From Swiss-Prot:
GO function term, MF aspect, one: ATP binding
Family recorded in the similarity comment: Belongs to the GatB/GatE family. GatB subfamily.
EC nos: 6.3.5.-
Superkingdom assignment: Bacteria
Transmembrane portions of the chain: none
Descriptive protein name: Aspartyl/glutamyl-tRNA(Asn/Gln) amidotransferase subunit B
Subunit structure: Heterotrimer of A, B and C subunits.
BP terms from Gene Ontology: glutaminyl-tRNAGln biosynthesis via transamidation; translation
InterPro entries registered for this protein in UniProt: Asn/Gln-tRNA_amidoTrfase_suB/E, Asn/Gln-tRNA_Trfase_suB/E_cat, Asn/Gln_amidotransferase, Asn/Gln_tRNA_amidoTrase-B-like, GatB, GatB_C_1, GatB_Yqey_C_2, Gln-tRNA_amidoTrfase_suB_CS
Length: 476
């Protein structure tokens, strides 16, 4: 039997406000336990929540970016459950009327574009956390994170592989950081993923029993957890068993999921309207302000890069993965006047070096103007491709040295003496009679071999295009 995996994601996006959703306490990460726990988070008697306007404004921007419906009237509900890190005994969330509904997000997997529908995004507060380390067997409660504003973004169960789920999560991560509503720091919990996974016989309309894998904080773990969970469910069903609805945890060391708790019913919580919070009405002025503050979105910018700079759609998607990357490319491409070569260098040599060194583009010793200067020297014939790679390495090691100084210092100037190049061509032709005969017989690959020999003789300083023209002229 052929099985189909069905995946839906619930992603908790921590909004990068300076204060919490219902109090003025700081949201700064890394403080001493409970340093940022106000009377609201501690649930002291008589305190009331006050809505943070910036949370609403950031939620509106996400709704606009997802081309979603934005509900102008917002009410809050109490999600009731007991846990030590939730002193109130309930979490303030949105149940029936989320601020964002019916959005969509495009993903690309294996070159194919697919649209994933976003069911909703609702505002809610985060809980605190339990601390077990260094307390001699006791458990401490840290409420610094409690009350931190979240947008829980819920997709439709439309992903059919771990690769699609990872692509969706990456696309949403890119979008919320692009909009500057979330810092995207997964290690600090700013972007946490819950994956709902089920399997069914391929072609069956009815969904299988789903299991929810909680708190995945890396794309690699998301991929591993989904693949393991899908295989585990298939094994249960093929052995004649029944998949029980459950909440799962992923063990990254073992690369496997395990049951945290069984769910007897899908509706675990008793919700009711929060009487302490008035409805939040989004005004026309707020909508207009949010629209005016919206940046050019990645999809729009990618289309413009294709039209204005002649880059491929694939390269444009890579270049618009972040605002930092897009701004870097546009600055370098404008300065050099060479869109496609700039994209090739960014997505090739520069990306590989940054990855090797474990660095971010913002910290690169090769700035956009320096890359533009390098690309310009290739365009005007000063550098060949091979010499340009050597120049790039020198530029990386010598961030204060100009491209002109590097070319002179390392003797990287491409040969301009036509007579000297012609003499090298004659020498190579004389020493490679077999390749010459193959080329004359119509073997184009032989030409590349001859050009390669000339480039080797010139130590990479000859112009490959000039060499090729000379060879063709001499063998015509």
């Amino acid at each position: 039997m052929t099985w189909e995996t069905v995946i839906g994601l619930e992603i908790h996006v921590q909004l990068n406000t300076k204060s919490k959703i219902f109090s003025g306490a700081s949201t700064a990460f890394g403080a001493e336990p409970n340093a940022h726990a106000s009377v609201v988070e501690c649930a002291l008697p008589g305190v009331l929540p006050v809505m943070n306007r910036e949370v609403v404004e950031k939620a509106i921007k996400l709704g606009l970016a997802l081309d979603a419906k934005i509900n102008r009237k917002n009410v809050f509900d109490r999600k009731n459950y007991f846990y030590p890190d939730l002193p109130k005994g309930y979490q303030i969330s949105q149940l029936d009327l989320p601020i964002v509904e019916h959005g969509k997000l495009e993903i690309v997997v294996g070159g194919d574009v697919k649209t994933i529908n976003v069911t909703r995004a609702h505002m809610e507060e985060d809980a605190g956390k339990s601390v077990h380390e260094g307390l001699n067997g006791a458990t401490g409660i840290d409420l610094n994170r409690a009350g931190t504003p979240l947008l829980e973004v819920v997709s439709e169960p439309e992903m059919r592989s771990a690769a699609e789920a990872v692509a969706y999560a990456k696309a949403l991560h890119s979008l919320v950081t692009w909009l500057d509503i979330c810092d995207g720091n997964m290690a600090e919990g700013s972007f946490r993923i819950d994956a709902n996974v089920s399997v069914r016989p391929k072609g069956q309309a009815e969904f299988g029993t789903r299991r929810e894998i909680k708190n995945l904080n890396s794309f690699r773990f998301l991929d591993q957890a989904i693949n393991y969970e899908a295989e585990a469910q298939i094994e249960i069903l093929e052995d004649g068993g029944t998949v029980q609805q459950a909440t799962m945890l992923f063990d990254p060391e073992k690369g496997e999921t395990r049951v945290m708790r069984l769910k007897e019913d899908a509706h675990d919580y008793g919700y009711f309207p929060d009487p302490d919070l008035l409805p939040v009405i989004i005004s026309d002025a707020q909508m207009q302000k949010a629209k005016a503050e919206m940046p050019e979105l990645p999809k729009e910018m990618a289309a413009r890069f294709v039209a204005d700079y002649g880059v491929s759609e694939y390269d444009a998607r890579l270049l618009t993965a972040s605002r930092v990357q897009a701004a870097y490319f546009e600055e370098a491409a404008k300065e050099s006047g060479q869109g496609k070569p700039t994209a090739n260098w960014m997505n090739g040599e520069l990306a590989a070096t940054l990855n090797k060194e474990g660095m971010e583009l913002a910290d690169s010793p090769i700035t956009a103007p320096r890359l533009a200067a390098l690309v310009g020297k290739i365009a005007d014939g000063t550098l060949s491709g091979k010499l340009a790679k050597k120049a790039f390495e020198a530029m990386w090691a010598e961030p204060e040295t100009s491209i002109a100084e590097i070319i002179e210092k390392h003797s990287l100037q491409q040969m301009t003496d036509t007579g000297a190049v012609e003499a090298m061509v004659d020498e190579v032709l004389a020493n490679n009679a077999k390749a010459v005969e193959q080329f004359k017989s119509g073997n184009e690959k032989a030409l590349n071999a001859i050009v390669g020999q000339v480039m080797k003789t010139s130590k990479g300083k000859a112009n490959p295009a000039q060499v090729q023209e000379l060879i063709k002229a001499k063998l015509a």
